[in-house]
Amino acid sequence: TTDIVAVDLNCLLYQLEITIAEAFQLLKQPLLARRYQTAAERRKEAILRYCWNAESQFFEDYNFRKGHTTGRRTLAGVFTLYAKIATSEQAAMVAHTIKQEFLKKGGLVTTLEQNGQQWDSPNGWAPLQYIAIMGLREYGYHGLANEIRDRWLAANDRVFSEKRKMVEKYDVVHAEAGGGGEYPLQDGFGWTNGVYAALYDEKERNRGE
C-alpha cells in the first residue's frame, strides 16, 4: 500500500545516496557530493525517528497515515544493521529478537505470521539471510551470524541431497523445501545459488584462519 514507508527500501536508498555522494567526491564535485550526503543524513534521521518501535524494540515499516509503525516485525528490520543505521543499543535489541523469535532450524523465518503466503512463515529467503548475517557482523554479533549461516547452509544441503536441486525458498521451520503463495516452488535459483556460494566460501575461509 502507498500508506506504508518501507524500512528496507529506505535503508537501500540511504546506501545509494552515500555511494553517489562518494562518487561525486571522487569526481571533484563537492557541491553535488554534499547534496547527496545531506540527503542520506536526513534519511537516516527519519528512519531512526519513524521506523523504530520502542515497544517492540525492533525496526518496522511506518504507516504515515496512521502516524505510527505497523507493529509487524519482519526481516526488513535488519536492513538497518546492514546499512549501519541502527545505534549499538538498537542493534543489540534487534539481535536479541532475531535469535529468540526469527531463528529456526533452517535459518531465519521472514516474518512471524503464518498465513499461507510465500513471504511469511515458515519460509526463509536467501537474500534476507545474507542481509541479516552481514548486518549482524557490522555490529560484532559474529556468533549469531555464524549460527544463521550454518543452519541455512545445512537446510540447503538437506534439500539438495533429497531433491538434487536448489530451490527458490525454504521452509526454515522444518528445514525443507518451501511452499505457499500463488505459484509452484521454482527450481534454480539465482539468489539461492549466489548466497550459498558466498556463505560457503566465507565459512571455508574462517575455517582456515
Model-derived regions, located:
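Well-ordered alpha-helical scaffold segments within catalytic/enzyme domains
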Residues: C11-P30, F79-E89, Y130-H142, V195-N206
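Peripheral, non-catalytic segments that deliver or gate enzyme domains
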Residues: A6, Q117-Y141
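Amphipathic alpha-helix face/heptad-repeat signature
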Residues: L9-L12, Y36
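Extended glycan-interaction surfaces of carbohydrate-active proteins
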Residues: T1-V5, R42-G124, D157-E209
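Extended, well-ordered alpha-helical scaffold segments
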Residues: L16, I20, L27-I47, E89-E101, ...
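Short amphipathic alpha-helical segments
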Residues: M93, P127, I131, L144-R151, ...
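Amphipathic alpha-helical coiled-coil segments and their boundaries
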Residues: T2, A6-L9, Q29
